């Protein structure tokens, strides 16, 4: 199957923060064979490649954007088999386009433990790996066994966890030599019971609903927590940014590290709030807050 090319996708319609102008094109990859034609398609279209799943950690700028969106839309059913190296472990291969909540539902039904903390986190499996998404003590890197990636320099390769860099909200594959697309991942999970896994997921999801604006248009946490372990949300709280807004954008009144689109906000409003918060926190506490949300185009 060849890549499917869509003209002029509007990122406001493709990101959970509901911001963003029009990209040059979107290249949708519906199966593994479609990756073969990707380099030629990108060369013909021009622009900067940008990989997009559900757009749940993206702040896209308004206006015309020199981006070609790559959408790894593979959604084959997860496959599971016993780990030959560990009796209490199960390996699960998942396509990048599978939504994270769908995967968690499958894991709960099979009593497979390791990602309960990500209950309530939106996005796709590929996107979760690409940013090493994590919550409540779990992250994708901690259960990653291998990842199948495509890059212009390598083609499709399977990379073991030992050859990946999994850091706090960061994931990279040095062998890729530049941009790459996650096509599928294999996770190593612990055997548990369906009841225990479901109960943990339910508890984590309920806690998120109480403490995070999960029903509003947001892109998750704006800033990473500083390396000394202090919460970025607490620093923003101390500096008076909980609930502070500009135009249609505001820091959530429920959790200060979430930026929400209240009413037709703009990317300029969002960037002004982010820059104001960064400067205020650095002046008051000495902490320079590093972005967790991805700004498109990159700065």
Swiss-Prot record:
The active site is at residues 169, 221, 292. Pathway: Cell wall biogenesis; peptidoglycan biosynthesis. The keyword Cell wall biogenesis/degradation applies. Residues 19-192 form the FAD-binding PCMH-type domain. Transmembrane segments: none annotated. It catalyses: UDP-N-acetyl-alpha-D-muramate + NADP(+) = UDP-N-acetyl-3-O-(1-carboxyvinyl)-alpha-D-glucosamine + NADPH + H(+). Pfam families: FAD_binding_4, MurB_C. Its EC number is 1.3.1.98. Belongs to the MurB family. This is UDP-N-acetylenolpyruvoylglucosamine reductase. The gene is murB.
């Amino acid at each position: 199957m060849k890549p499917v090319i869509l003209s002029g996708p509007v990122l406001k319609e493709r990101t959970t923060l509901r911001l963003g102008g029009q990209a040059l094109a979107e290249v949708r990859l519906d199966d593994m064979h479609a990756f073969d034609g990707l380099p030629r398609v990108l060369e013909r279209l021009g622009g900067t490649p940008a990989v997009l799943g559900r757009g749940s950690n993206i702040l896209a700028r308004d206006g015309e954007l020199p981006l070609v969106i790559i959408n790894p839309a593979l959604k084959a059913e997860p496959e599971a088999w016993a780990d030959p190296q560990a009796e209490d472990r199960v390996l699960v291969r998942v396509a990048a386009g599978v939504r994270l909540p769908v995967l968690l539902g499958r894991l709960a039904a099979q009593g497979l433990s390791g990602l309960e903390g990500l209950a309530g986190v939106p996005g796709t499996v590929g996107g979760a790996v690409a940013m090493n998404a994590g919550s409540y003590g779990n992250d994708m890197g901690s259960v990653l066994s291998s990842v199948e990636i495509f890059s212009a320099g390598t083609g499709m390769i399977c990379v073991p966890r030992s050859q990946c860099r999994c850091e706090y909200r960061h994931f990279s594959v040095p062998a890729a030599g530049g941009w790459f697309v996650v096509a599928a991942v294999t996770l190593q999970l612990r055997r548990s019971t369906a009841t225990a896994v479901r109960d943990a997921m339910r508890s984590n999801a309920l806690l998120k609903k109480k403490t995070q604006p999960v029903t509003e248009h947001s892109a998750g946490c704006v800033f990473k927590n500083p390396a000394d372990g202090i919460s970025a949300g607490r620093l923003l709280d101390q500096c008076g940014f909980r609930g502070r807004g500009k135009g249609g954008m505001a820091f959530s009144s429920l959790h200060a590290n979430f930026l929400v689109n209240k009413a037709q906000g703009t990317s300029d409003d969002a960037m002004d709030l982010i820059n104001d918060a960064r400067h205020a926190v650095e002046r008051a506490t000495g902490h320079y807050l590093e972005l967790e949300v991805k700004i498109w185009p990159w700065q």
